[in-house]
Regions:
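Detector for outer-membrane/organellar transmembrane beta-barrel domains
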Residues: 308-424
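Bacterial N-terminal signal peptides
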Residues: 9-18
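Outer-membrane beta-barrel "beta-signal"
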Residues: 436-438, 461-475
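Bacterial N-terminal signal peptides that target proteins for export
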Residues: 1-8
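Outer membrane beta-barrel
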Residues: 130-161, 169-284, 296-299, 303-314, ...
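N-terminal periplasmic/intermembrane-space "pro-region" immediately following the signal or transit peptide
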Residues: 20-153
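Sequence/structural signature of outer-membrane beta-barrel proteins
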Residues: 150-152, 193, 206-210, 235-237, ...
């Protein structure tokens, strides 16, 4: 994996004006010195800045910066030392719950009663931890290191995630071991107040790309009801996503992130939310044999969902509509209308147990699961493929440090008589795990995975996998 030190410096210089830092405040004079910042404890009700005086000299509930090679010493009131520059600290900032609420974004789902067990889908909560403050602005730096140790008992071509469509049929027996840390993640959540409104920028990336290069997962701006940028599609429901250690997840879950412009609005009462979005589109077609051409996207994806939130339950109905096309070489574009519906639900059985479910169906939506949207229906014709998927699962906290998740899902893609007989017809996915948190922000887990693949001609293959993961969360 190649390092990119310029990326960090670029982010610092881009964010410095937003955070109210000027050239006088940037410690550039001494490259040999490094900054050490004491992270605020979210349990504390106050953080001391400016002229506020700690109760004792040993009280370290405030930020300070000193030389990395020197002792951690309290600064003079109102200053922090970074030889040879003396920096003024920001104005007094209260990190109590009221401060967290001050920067709360109305539709960003910072916290949820459904966050039971492992949650690698949502942004880190904007409270405590590694937060940088400036005048009327705050930035949370989040992320984690995740190391995966994988052993496959059967052939599967996707060694880093459990993609059941990559299970070969009638392959000779083989086993495989794989260690990687590609799911490790880094995020920057910046918020400020403008005319009594919270403006938010969120950028997130990981290393799950070719050659382990840093890649973009999410990048969006949000103010009030408007969100613009790349994030989870409006067609999905993060609250109903399975808590798996496996990166891929269930075969029916819509785990797709794409560029979009979304408007979210409460209707009738605060428990009912309507979201409407125009999103980027992708069309995958298996063209008839002997016909050359290109897939076309005449329209974006028009997506919406209606979500009902209650104290112990959440129900969401999502829909999408789009126009897709194929242009044979030298001929006009042939278009079809594709659609889909996604029903999801989450229910808190107890304070430590939740169950979730999903039903997904439509025509021409296979690409939302990296499958074909259309296939040949005759020698020189094609049509949209129907798809039907479903999932059930449960997550349980055994105690404060031990949790488990169970998920089973199935996805069926329609077939035609003119398809390649080795194309995918049906996939299934089963996951069961046990996750232990021996220390704060440290998790160790083991997960069993089983999947099947059935082809159009009826041939089947299956795979068993065992995965162990170590996760270290940023504060």
């Amino acid at each position: 994996m190649q390092s990119n030190p310029g990326l960090f410096m670029f982010l610092i210089f881009m964010l410095a004006p937003t955070l109210g830092w000027t050239q006088d405040h940037l410690p550039l004079a001494n490259a040999a010195t490094a900054a050490r910042i004491r992270v605020n404890d979210p349990q504390e009700t106050q953080t001391y800045f400016g002229d506020s005086q700690p109760e004792t000299a040993s009280d370290t509930r405030y930020a300070t910066i000193d030389e990395a090679t020197g002792p951690f010493v309290p600064p003079e009131p109102g200053t922090a030392s970074l030889d040879p520059i003396v920096q003024p600290l920001p104005e007094y900032t209260d990190l109590s719950s009221s401060e967290e609420a001050r920067f709360a974004s109305p539709f960003s789902n910072d916290s949820s009663q459904f966050d039971i067990g492992l949650n690698l889908y949502s942004a880190p909560p904007f409270a405590g931890g590694l937060i940088v403050f400036g005048p009327n602005v705050a930035m949370k730096i989040g992320g984690f290191v995740k190391a995966d140790f994988i052993y496959d008992f059967n052939p599967i071509d996707s060694t880093d995630s459990f993609v059941t469509t990559s299970i070969p049929v009638d392959a000779p027996p083989r086993t495989n071991s794989r260690f990687h840390a590609r799911q490790s993640r880094l995020s920057f959540d910046t918020r400020w107040l403008s005319d009594d409104r919270v403006v938010r920028i969120y950028v997130e990336g990981d290393f799950f790309s070719e050659d382990d290069q840093f890649r973009l997962r999410q990048a969006f701006g949000e103010v009030g009801s408007l969100l613009v940028g790349r994030t989870w599609t409006t067609f999905t429901d993060v609250a109903a996503a399975p808590a798996t250690l496996d990166f891929e997840g269930s075969v029916s879950n819509v785990n797709r992130r794409q560029a979009q412009a979304r408007w979210t609005q409460m209707i009738f009462h605060e428990d009912l939310k309507l979201a409407l979005a125009v999103e980027d589109t992708r069309f995958i077609i298996d063209a008839p044999t002997g016909i050359t051409g290109e897939a076309r996207n005449p329209s974006p994806d028009f997506v919406g969902h209606l979500r009902l939130d209650r104290e112990r339950a959440q129900i969401q109905v999502a829909s999408l509509f789009r126009v897709v096309g194929f242009q044979p070489t030298g001929q006009p574009v042939i278009t079809r209308s594709a659609w889909g519906l996604n029903f999801t639900g989450v229910y808190l059985v107890t304070e430590t147990t939740k169950v979730y479910s999903q039903i997904l169906f439509g025509e021409g939506i296979g690409s939302y699961r990296d499958l074909p949207d259309a296939a040949p229906t005759a020698v020189d014709q094609g049509g949209l493929l129907p798809m039907f998927g479903w999932m059930i699962g449960a997550t349980h906290n055994w105690n404060e440090s031990l949790s488990s998740n169970f998920t089973y899902a199935q996805n069926d893609l329609g077939t035609t008589a003119f398809q390649n007989p080795n194309d995918v017809d049906q996939t299934t996915y089963l996951s069961a795990n046990l996750i232990w948190s021996p220390l704060e922000r440290v998790k160790v887990g083991v997960e069993y995975l089983y999947g099947t693949r059935k082809n159009v001609n009826g041939a089947m293959g299956d795979a068993h996998r065992l995965q162990a993961s170590f996760i270290f969360d940023l504060p």
